[in-house]
Amino acid sequence: MTLDLDASKKDEKLLITTIQQEYKILAEYKMIESEKLSGIYVIPSYENSLQWYGVFFGRQGFYAESVFRFSILLPDRFPDEKSLPSIIFQQDVMHPHVCPFTHTLDISHAFSEWRCGEDHLWQVLKYMQAIFFDPVDSIRGIETDKLKNAEAAELLMNNRQEYAARVQENIKESKAHIYDTPPTEDPHYIVFEKFQPDVHGPVLERIKAGRNKAEASQQANGGHATGLSWVKEGEFKPLSIE
């Protein structure tokens, strides 16, 4: 009987711990939503909240027009343990902070360890935005041998034409697979559909109408508009109201 009671208490404690963790992860997602990060879309997996799916849209600079899929893997005891989340791209991404072998983004230069209550996932995504917006600035003051991709760093500093060409190869390769069959049946996996005028046209027109209305409202009250987004075939640009 004593053993049964002990087992029951352990199960109850585990359940409470799991619920608390799920609540904290949901809070992280809500914070990301409230930040309205431009060009980055993420969502937790339906099956496992410790795994997230994401897509990065480059807007300018070397990575303009890029569409890179990535996953976020959270430590088992996130956010209470000091281990950092992992961001892993699904394809090659030429960048000094991205490992060419594992495709993992190194965030340790901004986050030495995870501080529960102080560090948040939206900050990690902001960091991702910043290093792709200005890769040169992202490596300033960092020794080359401390970077995940020393070759990328050397090209960035000494042969930017070649660096840009390598990045364009990555972008072309990524776009070539944007409509591939999802590698998982998880309903939260981010899927792109080719633009079909008869199906998506009416939706696009409603978006445009809403954008015009929102812009008029924004001019009137100085507020920020939000709304739906879509992607035109061949362009990969979110037609979002921002």
Curated annotation (Swiss-Prot):
Pfam families for this protein: UQ_con (PF00179)
CDD domains xref list: UEV_AKTIP
Cited InterPro entries: Ub_conjugating_enzyme, UBQ-conjugat_E2_core, UBQ-conjugating_enzyme/RWD
Domain UBC core: 20-176
Family: Belongs to the ubiquitin-conjugating enzyme family. FTS subfamily.
Protein name stated in the entry: Protein crossbronx
Organism: Drosophila ananassae
Gene name as annotated: cbx
